[in-house]
Amino acid sequence: MNTIIDASNDAKYRKYQDAIRKCIALFQTVEQWPDYISFLTKLHKVLQTHSSFVNIPCSLLVSRALAECLSPGLPSGVHKKTLEVYDYIFTIIGSKTLTNELSTWSYGLTPFFSISSIKTKHDYINIIKKHYVSLGVGIRPCFQAVFISLLSGLEEDVDESSQEVYHLLDDLVKVLNDEKFAWGCIWSTILSFPSQRPGALAYLLRVCNNLAEEDIQTRVIQPDSGLVVRSFAAAISDNDILVQRGYMDALLNYFPIQSTFYKDVKPFDLKLLHMSVASIVLRNDLSLNRRFYAWLMGLSKDTELSISDSSITVDENTLQQNMAIFFEGVKDLLSSKNSLMSFYKAFRILYALSDRRPLFTIVESQILPCVLHSYETLTNVFHRDDSKHLYESAVDHGRRLIMKFSDSELHTFLFHCVNKIVANTTENSDSAEAVKFILDSQNFFFESINTEYSFIIFTNLLMHLEKTSPNSDVDGVSMTILTICKILLNNFDWNFFNYNNSAIDSYAKCTLNLDSDFENGILTYEILYKKCKCSLLSLLKQYIKDSHVHHEVLLISLNLIKEASDTEFENEFLDLSLQGFKDNSWSFQTLGSFVKQLPSRILINSTACVNVILDRIWCELCMFSYFREEELLSVIWTLQEKLQTRIIESYFSTCIVKEQLELRAPTIYYTPFYNLLKKSAQQSLFHFVFDRPLLLLLNSLLEDESGRDYTAMMNWINASSSLQLRVLELMTENLLSLSPNLTSVNSLETAMTRYNINEDQRNSEASRCVYFLKLCTRIISYFQDLHPKEGRLKSAKQVEELCLVTWADALLIQKKSLTYSSFLAFLVKLCLDIVLTPQNIKTSTDVYIIQTWALRLLYQITSIWENPLKFESSLIVGLFALVQEVERSPSSTYRSFILSLLQMLEFLLSRLDGTIDLSSEQHYLLSNFVLVGMLNDDPGLSPKWLHAIKKLLPLLLQNLQLLMVNPIQSLCKFVHSFLDQHESMYLKYPDPVKDYACMDVFIAKLKMLSELVSAALLEFTYSPGPKKSNLEANGIIGNVISGVFAAESSGVSIDVNKRLSMLLTMQDALQTLFLSYSWHIRSSYADKTSKVFMNDSSVLKEASLSGLKEFYFCEPLECVETLVQIYLENNVECCQCIWDIFSFLSDSEPQYIVKQLVSSFFAREGIASYAGPSSLTAKITQLDILCCMSDFVSRVEGENTSKIFTEISKFVREIISSSNSFKNYLLVCLRMLLEVAKNVNTYCESRQQKDFIDLMGKTLSSVLFHAGKSSDPNLTVDFLAYHKAAADTFEVAKTQKKTSSVYLFVKYLDPSLLDFFCSEFVPKITELSKEEDKLVAWATSIVNVFITPLVKARTFPESLTTYHLDLLLVLSKHPFLSKSWRRDFWEIFNDNSLFRFDIDQLRKLSPVIYTALYQEISRLNDLITKSDLGVTTLFTSRDTQLGARQSNICRITILMLSSPRDFFLPSLPPLIDLVKRLITSDPEGVLKKDLFLFIRALALRTSSKHLLPLWPIVVSELLIIFKSYCMPNVAISKETLLDACRLLDFLTALKLEEFALHEWVVMLSPLDAVYWSGKTSRKSLVQKVSERLQEQASEKDDKSSVESEHSILTSTTRTPSLGIYTTDAQLRNFLNRISIDAYEESYSFSTIDIQSFENSIYREVLQRFSNAPLSPFSSIKAPSSLAGSSN
């Protein structure tokens, strides 16, 4: 691009111009700083020689050179000489020309004062005083820049130059002749320039000190009070505490809270100021806090600091006015329900304010409801783990804040809430909850509990309830009110108010409007007490139908009776209660509370009350209420403890007698009263309450009336062991300790009882024995003619039931002495006939009873003989048949029959020692017996049946298929069914006892399953012969390979078919045990309410592990292989159970599991030649085994690592020795080694560590040898698609394990390896070895396989997948590995294909770029050198060289964006020099766009203060472009103009302080644009550009773009306004609004969106090298040479 040339025909002027050009060219050849002085001197001489010319030629170039000479990096001598040249130029051009060319000459001079030394400050001041002050109003465009530059000289008042600066500033303001604009500049400086706030404060205080108090606000509050307020808010929020103190002092002394100008400020701005002032308490600085309090109170700073709080008196109305806005601001914070920080901030501010009571009392009453509501919300809603500390701090400060509120305010708030409740307003529910919340924490919130207020509120609420008719609408509020009343009960004593004639508190009386409820006169506490009693009695009558409210009122009434001695109320309450219980209008819940809370003295003195209570209890019993039994017993025991008499016992006895007399039928034994006796048998008070009723029942039992039915009574006694104990205690006076010493009889020949009974002795023992003797006699006489006569079955039932409570030896007792061989023989024959020929019994109803009796009697008789009898063997078979022949029934009689049968069977089996031979038909009977027992779920029967089956194991093993397989399979089905239906079973059995019982049955069957399978496996264990002695395991696969199941296995000593059958059965059983072990995961039992299933999960797991341990002992390899199959079929959670099982089975020796997995792996190598059953080999593959082994190894920790390493080492060496055959398994081996590595260095010996490193290197080499050989371009795409589909399936169904690279190795070799290296290997590479050289070598080998070929082939970025980028990324996280990838990376980076990457890829590569650059910073110098115009290459075209420079500049830009902030500070000077040379030496402006992008990146990644040398260059270039575009004879492309506008947009949006000092050069002052609409100033340069664009416009304005920009301005974040594609209309709109936008961005306190700024640069860099144009009116294309590589 051509620079601006002054057109003049004057030969002297052309000579002058040439001389200037030569001087300017010298500045581009500077090598050392003395050269600057030399060149400045020559320039000065040229100017002196041609001093007759007012206009200086090439003024923009001269001003740029002078601005560069004022760079902070140059010595003060250069600065002094430069200022001298400036002074001379200003002298020769004069004020008029300087005014016209102010933007040309001032942009380099104005920022200098802040960096100047003492030697040059005076020179600068003289220039401003001499040349700028004289400009008058012409200084307006640069006034703020000059003013800000001078503020840095005011930081030290003691400095002599400071006074000179003060006077100079006053002069500038004076000559400007516009105080409004001047103060606008000052306030905007405070708002937008944090570094200049100290100087601005000093000037502000000086001006205010020199003004009269009444003139300060009229002179200073300009041009807008909102701007002033926001400036103060920004300054008080500054990070520098000294700045905060200074501006708080200014507020205190000159802008007090009562200032009139605040009335003109918008509420939002004023609230912003108040919250900024209030937020200074968060700094925990006492001096700031004092200033805050003083400002709120309207005091001066000195007054507040010198006078104690007690002497400060401020009018309350004034304080209320002062704090009105403050209160609104805090209220806004407290209303932010979703902001935890807002709550914390509000609580902190108010808590700090509470230390100043004069201030706090003003807002106390107003803010209390908000604080309480917010604190309640905080404690009930917020539960954030990620901000736990903030949450706890907010809760703590909130609680402490509420404690700061006075008790009177809290009571006032309570009174108001009570009034709302009583008034039945729409807020009554919220008010009730608020009262409840306060009272719940009253011990924290109140200093002391006011008993009078509590009683008054209590009475008022009761009166309100009395007036409110009960309905569903108020039920919730009523319950809340009653909850409040119960809390208030603890705050006062009834007796205190009973006879208290003192008047109630007048404040409470007025606040609660109690006068309206009582007659005129003095209202005393005694009157309230009486009213309270009446209300309670009324409520008891009123809320009878609402059981909840009624119950709560009853509790309150009982509390009054308990604490107050009020006979009158007691009598009325008892009368009401008795009537309620009599007519059943009061619920049973009320009865329970009534008995528990009523004092004992009332119960003892009121027989009628006790009788009514007992009547209600008996009525409840008669209602057959099963679920009320526990409640009834609780009431009975409570009543007995309070009465301490036998009145309850007498009452129940009377009721029983009445029932017996009235009913005269067996139904008496079915009444719920007997269930009550059964449940209460374990209570210590049983004998005091139930002895006499129990005696009545037993007396009826002992009567010999033929019509009496004893069945129900005997069943009832037998149903509870505790009740049996009570019966025995009652009959025998602790019979357990006085039982008779009966001598057992050994044989029939000598069978003679040696126990003598004296019937004349009437003690309990003798009487009971005689009683049982009579029973035996009746049995003998009765069964003589049993079968033919059905009429006596009823009597037989009675006799049999009575025998249930006899002792075993009692049947053998006769009168004094007696031989009874014939008696026993008769009984045995009788019992055998009943047991073996049940068909002879005609009535099925009683068959179970008769057979049960026969079995029990037979058991007693058989036990007399020591040796087995002949009939016992046939009796066992008969028992098997009996189970099949007898019809099953859910009745209790069938249950008793089975129990007797199992007892007899176990007894006979123990006597015969298993010496029983069964025929095939008898085997069937045995199988049926076993299956029936397996299917039985009765909690009482099943364990005994299973125990009997264990005794039958020797018989079961005789016929494996019939007797073992079917029961095992039925058990497996039972387990599956039980676990699948556990939820429905819980609903079926709500009683915990039944839950436990069912679980006990299940556990017993689970153990039986394990024992059956283990016994069968031990019976058919295979021992390989000599030819197969080298096998390490004998599972199914091992047996297949070894030929055990082949046709030629004739030499095998076991039944192969039986063994095969049992191994397959064991697989099913093992899966069943695993299902039980992992049931707690599948069932999600944690969400259930059943305590049984939760507590029994550990028992279930223990039983399952025990069975698995037995399987593993019998068949270790087969057990492991089956677990591998389960591992493959289940999800991730269940797989964790597999590892737990492996750990349990290995018993701290995990190498055995690894050894068995390895054996299984190699055994499968020969499966292809096997012709046996396919089901034995098709379930799992070798890869499946390795996957399982890898996961298992990953979970081995600690010292166990050294145990498994040997086995893994052998296995891996075997694999890599035949890598071609086992190439599909190399990745799994590598993964296993990686998992072992985490513990090798810690727990293994040094020799193992060396072996590990050697093995890892060989394995990695083997893996990489087979990689990189695929040519399929879609391989990675298919791999990613497979990954995504698998991941989606896992998220939706949760039915399979998370996809691992291991499973994809065979099909997708390269991408699965890359995935493994990125996700597992490289992140853990430091765990593999401590030798960095080894690690670097391994990383290099990986890079050489996956990255280097792509680099050499130049196929990136298309061939660089996300995995390749991830690999570079994870490698870059280990700096010492950079040697492995840096060379390839720099080849990628230096190739122009870099610019074909997308933004996301470049962002992902950012850490890689930064790491590479950090370790080779010299690369940056190389790029700078290659980008310099002075570097050329022989035999290279100009376009190629230009393209190389463009690409290298863009590379530097990418480097800049990839690095952290201020990383390039050491290299900043050469970078800025590069920008200078390229901008000033680029004749066609081709590099402008690239340089502008680089400047944007530099501004984004470098602190603005470090870029001071750069800004003059940038500003001058913008000046040149904009001025040139406005000139008709200079060709500037719109593309270049757009680039310049984007740069200006970027820098103004960043709000860099140092650049903001130069914005006035090209754009209108924001103050002029906002407040004066630009009427007071000349058109800015950007306005002229906009008009020029308008002249050339070929399209209408795009209104939509304007509106979109307005929406951007209202955002809380700042982003660049101009996009990559920008129309003329959008550009004009931007230029017209840039000043206003800049002001609004500062005014609104918006923050920058870093990512948007970065993306804007990335997009334009990448677009620069694409074929698409940058904008619709782009006129310059990237050179064709950009497609080539950089040089």
Swiss-Prot record:
Q: Spell out which residues are annotated as carrying Phosphoserine.
A: 1671
Primary location group: Golgi
Topology relative to the membrane? Peripheral membrane protein
Superkingdom as given in the UniProt entry: Eukaryota
> Which key words are in the record?
Golgi apparatus, Membrane, Phosphoprotein, Protein transport, Transport
What are the subcellular locations of this protein? Golgi apparatus membrane
Q: Name one GO biological process term.
A: endoplasmic reticulum organization
A single GO cellular-component term from the record reads:
endosome
PANTHER family per the UniProt record, alphabetical: DOPEY-RELATED, PROTEIN DOPEY-1 HOMOLOG
Family under the similarity heading: Belongs to the DOP1 family.
What does this gene product do?
Involved in cellular morphogenesis. Required for traffic between late Golgi and early endosomes, and for the normal structure and organization of the endoplasmic reticulum.
Would you tell me the protein name for this molecule? Protein dop1
Lineage start: Eukaryota, Fungi, Dikarya, Ascomycota, Taphrinomycotina
Q: Which gene encodes it?
A: dop1
